[in-house]
Swiss-Prot record:
Compositionally biased region (Acidic residues): 408-435, 442-455
GO molecular function, one term: DNA binding
Role noted for this protein: Histones H3 and H4 chaperone involved in the nucleosome formation and heterochromatin silencing. Required for the deposition of H3K56ac-carrying H3-H4 complex onto newly-replicated DNA. Plays a role in the transcriptional regulation of the cell-cycle dependent histone genes by creating a repressive structure at the core histone gene promoter.
Descriptive protein name: Histone chaperone RTT106
Annotated gene: RTT106
A Pfam short name: PH_18
Basic and acidic residues bias spans: 47-66
UniProt family annotation: Belongs to the RTT106 family.
Lineage: Eukaryota, Fungi, Dikarya, Ascomycota, Saccharomycotina
Organism: Debaryomyces hansenii (strain ATCC 36239 / CBS 767 / BCRC 21394 / JCM 1990 / NBRC 0083 / IGC 2968) (Yeast)
Length: 482
């Protein structure tokens, strides 16, 4: 065999036999086949060089370009995701971070030359299956993955099967840690169930069968048994790809994920269905921005966290970085919680975050959680008490304490770079709250109200005033006569 024909030996044995049979039957065909192979070899090499050039040019972005906020050590997914590469997917999911759009959440395999296939999580367009965001090295890139109930939905029978699926990325897996927004989406498990039934992946009668099996031990506040089975399946799929998803949705079984509090403004979940809460989530404000404070206990995969979300910017910090917690602005209905935390992103600078307008009915359960994590209550700190005293000396008393507003007003929704401690220099929620001049406008208002009251009293009853003048005049005349 000549050197020109050595390429035949590189073919699979079946294909070799077919080529040899063709050449024996039609000897001139060997030249045509050889030219055909040379043509494809040359064009494939040129295509690879061109693709490599495009990938190395920073000004040229392919369709599968990963946004800067989620880039870094991750490599991009070139072009469309093919059906044979998909491990599983959740189609038409509503994402609210880092982008607001309906996308397919896809776990798929990425095969790179000379490497074994690796699982990748991509957010892809439903029509083209071209990724807008892709996360590689899932086991080391994902910091926290949780499935959460949504405040206001857990009390509604028609909405409690909708959960919030959240992925937080490690800062060292992003090119810019200050723009490292989490991936957050709403998953309607009733819709997922219909999609799986339509695809033939679960039988149509499965829901009825599971409901009958769990009827004797069913929780009235839990999600449907079929949806819980789907979540268990997803957890296994996530784990195969390197992600440990922690589920906090209330269980259909009375022996796990029990709701110890279930209101429109607050939810608490006990994973073991006992008195120990593993999730506490309540409505709160940070400045003028409304949201929810979440507190998560540690588990076998994650450390404990405090989170504020779910409008940008979304905050997350380790409970181990919390120095202490204090309570202020306490009224009959609401109170504020001030968290003092070490911000490692700013050279371990100590920062304070205030979460206000928390309903008093959740104070005990939140305070119990704080104490269970070994966090000190610093409400009677002397520095804070001195500032309150200064306020009292300015003439406002209790009114100043109640009117002092949380200082960190983070209502700049467009600021997606905010993280813990990323406020403007000079801002401090505690400093402004206890500033002796914080209520000076209130003093003026009170003074004006008092002046208005005096004026109103003077002119309130002109007839009575005239009658009083007549009595005085008559008394003087009687004295003169005497």
């Amino acid at each position: 065999m000549s050197n020109d024909q050595k390429w035949i030996k590189s073919l699979p044995s079946d294909l070799q036999n077919q080529v040899n049979a063709l050449v024996e039957a039609h000897p001139p065909s060997l030249t045509v086949i050889h030219k055909l192979c040379e043509y494809f070899k040359t064009n494939a090499s040129e295509h690879e060089d061109k693709r490599r050039k495009l990938s190395s040019d920073p000004e040229i972005k392919s369709e599968g370009h990963v946004p800067e906020a989620l880039s870094g050590p991750k490599s991009e997914v070139p072009g469309q995701i093919h059906e044979q590469e998909i491990i599983f997917e959740l189609p038409q999911i509503s994402f609210q971070s880092p982008i607001r759009k309906k996308l397919n959440l896809i776990f798929h395999l990425l095969v790179e030359p000379g490497q074994s296939p690796k699982p990748v999580m991509s957010l892809a367009l439903p029509t083209t299956y071209v990724p807008e965001i892709s996360i590689h090295n899932l086991a080391s890139s994902i910091r926290l993955c949780v499935l959460l109930p949504i405040l206001g939905n857990s009390t509604n029978n028609t909405k409690r099967n909708i959960g919030l699926l959240c992925f937080w990325i490690h800062d060292d897996a992003a090119s810019d840690p200050n723009k490292n927004d989490p991936i957050i989406c709403q998953v309607n498990f009733d819709q997922v169930k219909k999609q799986l039934i339509k695809a033939g992946k679960i039988p149509a009668e499965a829901e009825t069968q599971l409901k009958e099996m769990n009827e004797s031990n069913q929780s009235q506040d839990g999600i449907k048994a079929i949806n819980e089975a789907i979540i268990n399946f997803l957890q296994k799929q996530f784990q195969l790809c390197g992600i440990h998803m922690i589920n906090y949705l209330p269980s259909s079984s009375a022996t796990k994920n029990k709701l110890t509090i279930n209101t429109d403004a607050g939810v608490a979940v006990s994973s073991n269905a006992n008195s120990v809460n593993d999730l506490v989530m309540v409505e709160a404000y940070k400045g003028a921005r409304d949201g929810a404070v979440l507190m998560l206990t540690a588990n076998e995969y994650n450390q404990p966290y405090i989170i504020f979300g779910f409008k940008k910017p979304i905050l997350i910090f380790d409970i181990s970085k919390v120095q202490h917690v204090s309570y202020s602005n306490i009224t009959r209905l609401t109170y504020s919680m001030i968290v003092t935390v070490v911000n490692e992103k700013k050279d371990s600078k100590v920062e304070t975050l205030e979460f206000g307008m928390i309903d008093q009915k959740y104070f005990q359960i939140m305070d119990e959680f704080i104490k269970s994590q070994g966090i000190n209550d610093n409400s009677f700190d002397e520095d804070l008490r001195e500032k309150v005293t200064t306020n009292a000396n300015s003439g406002e008393g209790e009114q100043a304490s109640e009117q002092a507003a949380p200082a960190d007003s983070d209502d700049e929704e467009e600021d997606g770079t905010f993280q813990v401690g990323q406020e403007e220099e000079g801002e401090s929620s505690v400093d402004e709250e206890y500033d002796s001049n914080a209520g000076s406008d209130g003093d003026s208002d009170v003074g004006e109200e008092e002046d208005d009251t005096n004026e109103n009293n003077e002119g309130a009853n002109p007839a009575a005033s005239t009658e009083a003048d007549d009595v005085v005049t008559q008394s003087k005349e009687e004295d003169d006569e005497q």
